[in-house]
């Protein structure tokens, strides 16, 4: 039973880490990366469709993204969606290709992005701590129902705490790595 609670907590904590990784990939660094456009959707035949399903997205010359839409009539909609996003990118179209030059990040923009990254990391830490709290309350419930002893409960809580410490350390590692990436000019 204790192992079930611990493995459930571990899988939930790993999902929190995966969510943090996804959030970190969306934060713009100085380099172009197709995942920058993952959050952009376009109205296509009455459904919101992700931009990465509407065409080929590739990196050109390190600081430029190119989009080659499958349906050329969507070019104006794609441009509008990019302009309305909070990425601060200005698309330029040449024929059937949309180019997105990424402007270099200013020092102020870098600091703002570091704040965003820190907030995402804090959200992940809070999520992990909430999972720890849930697991500990499950252990207390088992103790209350006399399914485990107090020693087993304490041992289970120690295991959950060790798992929590390990996951929070991973969050710190991801945060440190992203901050260094952002502050590198």
UniProtKB/Swiss-Prot annotation:
Pfam families in UniProt: RRF
Stored InterPro entries: Ribosome_recyc_fac (IPR002661), Ribosome_recyc_fac_dom (IPR023584), RRF_sf (IPR036191)
Highest taxon above the source species: Bacteria
GO MF annotation terms: ribosomal large subunit binding
Keyword list, A-Z: Cytoplasm, Protein biosynthesis
GO biological process: cytoplasmic translational termination
Signal peptide start-end: none
Subcellular location: Cytoplasm
Any one cellular-component term (Gene Ontology): cytosol
NCBIfam families from the UniProt entry: frr
Family statement drawn from the similarity comment of this UniProt entry: Belongs to the RRF family.
Function: Responsible for the release of ribosomes from messenger RNA at the termination of protein biosynthesis. May increase the efficiency of translation by recycling ribosomes from one round of translation to another.
Protein name (record): Ribosome-recycling factor
Species whose genome carries this gene: Alcanivorax borkumensis (strain ATCC 700651 / DSM 11573 / NCIMB 13689 / SK2)
Gene expressing this chain: frr
């Amino acid at each position: 039973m204790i192992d079930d609670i611990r493995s459930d907590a571990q899988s939930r904590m790993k999902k929190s880490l995966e969510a943090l990784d996804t959030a970190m990939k969306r934060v713009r660094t100085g380099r172009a990366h197709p995942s920058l456009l993952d959050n952009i959707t376009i109205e296509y035949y009455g459904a919101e469709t992700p931009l990465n399903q509407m065409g080929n997205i590739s990196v050109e010359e390190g600081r430029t993204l190119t989009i080659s839409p499958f349906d050329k009539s969507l070019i104006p909609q794609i441009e509008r969606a990019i302009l309305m996003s909070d990425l601060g990118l200005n698309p330029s179209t040449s024929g059937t290709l949309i180019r997105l030059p990424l402007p270099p990040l200013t020092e102020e923009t870098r600091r703002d992005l570091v704040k965003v990254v820190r907030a995402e990391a804090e959200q992940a830490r809070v999520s992990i701590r909430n999972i720890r709290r849930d697991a500990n309350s499950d252990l207390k419930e088992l103790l209350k129902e006399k399914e485990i002893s107090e020693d087993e409960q304490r041992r289970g809580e120690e295991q959950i705490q060790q798992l929590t410490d390990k996951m929070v350390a991973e969050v710190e590692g991801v945060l440190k790595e992203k901050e260094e990436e952002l502050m590198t000019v």
